């Protein structure tokens, strides 16, 4: 899998974006063909699909965790299906405690703490496992643009800071599909980020299904130390902002590609940077689960989702069919 940082021209158009724009037509046409010629499979449970219309971190994982914890409070049997990013997975697998991130992906390992998880790179492979587990609800993390299965409820996550970038499709921009299509079809839209500033103009027409959410720290971390932050996630800027809002003194940071698998050399270099700055290393849970033996010298920032309108979410999730 190719791992990329979020290029600057994805946020603000420049000559590179315009050069790549014709290739975006090909991407759009291939997506159109998939939807035209595929008949969706109806899974034997209610399907809640959480996705986004752009590349990069938009808070999907935290939304899935929130949903999982919500369903637990209602004693509803559920299964989480994840995309196994960054893994060498060949077949759909029920995630076990002994699985590594290389085997099933970082998100799968994290979400397995919140419920039963099926990791897969091919949504068509999950059907036998779904029949085996017999859940009442299936939470699908990502696969929003995948036409191979029917979705009962769709939730689109939007990052407040990046929104829809430069408005171009991949590779000229960050979009997997144009927002008007995704948002119009969605049952709920999560706007993830600092709630100040109101609703962006681009989302105003979707206010009746909009939930504003913030990702807040849930860890108890010593604020009297210096920290050197690093991450290999889709939206590292939001991680660094969360650290700042938590009141930590960040003396430096390093960004790695999304879903990056750390080498021993990386960890040694990070340790040297931290030592030089008289600081302690700090990272995200997604990065922390991939570090292995070095995790005892690194602080992990855990986060949770806080939403402004839980009643709207409950109404959509628990409405009678």
Curated annotation (Swiss-Prot):
Pathway: Glycolipid biosynthesis; lipid IV(A) biosynthesis; lipid IV(A) from (3R)-3-hydroxytetradecanoyl-[acyl-carrier-protein] and UDP-N-acetyl-alpha-D-glucosamine: step 6/6. One of its GO terms (molecular function) is ATP binding. Keywords: ATP-binding, Kinase, Lipid A biosynthesis, Lipid biosynthesis, Lipid metabolism, Nucleotide-binding, Transferase. It catalyses: a lipid A disaccharide + ATP = a lipid IVA + ADP + H(+). SUPFAM superfamilies: P-loop containing nucleoside triphosphate hydrolases. One of its GO terms (biological process) is lipopolysaccharide core region biosynthetic process. ATP binds at residues 54-61. GO terms for cellular component: plasma membrane. It comes from the Bacteria. InterPro entries: LpxK, P-loop_NTPase. The keyword Transcription regulation does not apply. The keyword Lipid metabolism applies. Its EC number is 2.7.1.130. It is an enzyme of class 2 (transferase). HAMAP family: LpxK (MF_00409). Belongs to the LpxK family. Transfers the gamma-phosphate of ATP to the 4'-position of a tetraacyldisaccharide 1-phosphate intermediate (termed DS-1-P) to form tetraacyldisaccharide 1,4'-bis-phosphate (lipid IVA). This is Tetraacyldisaccharide 4'-kinase.
């Amino acid at each position: 899998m190719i791992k990329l940082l979020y290029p600057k021209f994805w946020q603000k158009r420049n000559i590179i974006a315009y050069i790549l724009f014709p290739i975006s037509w090909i991407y759009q046409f291939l997506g159109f063909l998939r939807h035209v010629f595929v008949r969706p499979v109806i899974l034997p449970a209610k399907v809640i699909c959480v996705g986004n219309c752009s590349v990069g971190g938009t808070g999907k994982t935290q939304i899935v965790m929130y949903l999982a914890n919500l369903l637990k409070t209602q004693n509803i049997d559920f299964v989480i299906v994840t995309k196994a990013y960054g893994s060498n997975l060949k077949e759909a697998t029920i995630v076990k405690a002994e699985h590594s991130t290389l085997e099933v992906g970082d998100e799968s390992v994290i979400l397995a703490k919140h419920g039963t998880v099926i990791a897969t790179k091919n949504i068509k492979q999950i059907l036998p496992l779904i029949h085996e587990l017999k859940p009442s609800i299936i939470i699908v993390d990502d696969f929003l643009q995948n036409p191979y299965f029917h979705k009962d409820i769709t939730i689109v996550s939007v990052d407040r800071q990046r929104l829809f970038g430069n408005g171009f499709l991949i590779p000229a921009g960050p979009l997997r599909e144009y927002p008007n299509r995704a948002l119009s079809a969605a049952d709920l839209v999560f706007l993830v980020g600092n709630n100040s500033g109101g609703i962006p103009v681009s989302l105003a027409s979707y206010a009746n299904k909009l939930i504003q959410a913030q990702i807040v720290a849930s860890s108890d971390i010593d604020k009297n130390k210096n920290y050197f932050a690093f991450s290999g996630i889709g939206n590292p800027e939001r991680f660094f902002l969360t650290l700042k809002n938590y009141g930590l003194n960040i003396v430096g940071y390093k960004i790695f590609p999304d879903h990056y698998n750390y080498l021993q050399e990386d960890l040694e270099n990070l340790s040297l940077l931290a030592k030089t700055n008289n600081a302690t290393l700090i990272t995200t849970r997604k990065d922390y689960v991939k570090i292995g033996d070095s995790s005892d010298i690194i602080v992990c920032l855990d986060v949770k989702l806080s939403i402004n309108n839980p009643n709207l979410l409950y109404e959509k999730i628990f409405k009678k069919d």
